[in-house]
Amino acid sequence: MPLLKLVFLGTGGAVPRSDRTLPAIYLEDWLGHRFLLDAGEGAQYRLLQIGVSPASLTAVAITHQHEDHTLGLPGLVITSRFLGGRTAVLAPRSMHKALEALGVEVMDSYGGDRLRVSCVEVCHTVDACGWLFQWDVGYKLDLSKAAGLPRWALTSLIRGSPVEVGGRLIKPEDVAEPGHKRLRRLLYTGDTAPCPEMWRKVGEVDVLIHEATFADDVEPQKAHEEGHSTVADAVEAAKALNAGVLILTHVSSRYPDKRRHRELAASVKPPPHVYVPEDFDTVLVRL
């Protein structure tokens, strides 16, 4: 079953609170990939608190150079090295030279088992990547069309490979359920103002993790000039991207709690499903 596990290790931004630390999200998929999305100060300790070794990460995906998203990286890299690992880091190209000095493997995209991760340019005050995850979940077969096919053939068809049975070539599309969507997508924006050009380039996503630095007490124009978004901006992005799940994070320390963010998110009509997690909350998403 295509299932994502997201653990929100740090849901604040810029300045931490005692109960809201700096940006870091642990993502684990059903294929065994393990990613850390941004590495705010103390990220490795928070990973250890949920039982994840820094050396076990597939990669760390950094959105941009600001310190609240990067100060946890050096310690994590050193710990991983002591444990026999070598950290791979996805980052904007403007950061590559500095990261290479840390002795890490620097990449601007990732291609693994049925997963691709790529940078999409967002609208921040510095060079910044949103990270687009795209999984190939295979085909869901129409059992009436696939009746009588041997098990080995079904396995190959689900994985997207054509088969020859009894002298007949069968393509996955021939026996798939109509309208089945083979690719599933998650976008993590990092810091961004509303970014219609990015929305158009990306198209659609299933899950959107979007910053919501401000609720509704800051003039939108001021938020945008600082390269950030309000709750309403994040909702607009989710609608533009046709996201089924919207998760709001990077909440400013000016808010003692997230009550107003939740009230605003709850007023969204029509949904997507909207979550405003606290530090260490886990969200499971079935793709």
From Swiss-Prot:
The active site is at D68 (proton acceptor). Keywords: Endonuclease, Hydrolase, Metal-binding, Nuclease, tRNA processing, Zinc. It catalyses: Endonucleolytic cleavage of RNA, removing extra 3' nucleotides from tRNA precursor, generating 3' termini of tRNAs. A 3'-hydroxy group is left at the tRNA terminus and a 5'-phosphoryl group is left at the trailer molecule. Its cofactor is Zn(2+). InterPro entries: Metallo-B-lactamas, RibonucZ/Hydroxyglut_hydro, RNase_Z/BN. Binds 2 Zn(2+) ions. Zn(2+) 2 binds at D68, H69, D191, H250. Zn(2+) 1 binds at H64, H66, H124, D191. Its EC number is 3.1.26.11. One of its GO terms (molecular function) is 3'-tRNA processing endoribonuclease activity. Belongs to the RNase Z family. Homodimer. PANTHER family: ZINC PHOSPHODIESTERASE ELAC PROTEIN 1 (PTHR46018:SF2). Zinc phosphodiesterase, which displays some tRNA 3'-processing endonuclease activity. Probably involved in tRNA maturation, by removing a 3'-trailer from precursor tRNA. This is Ribonuclease Z. The gene is rnz.
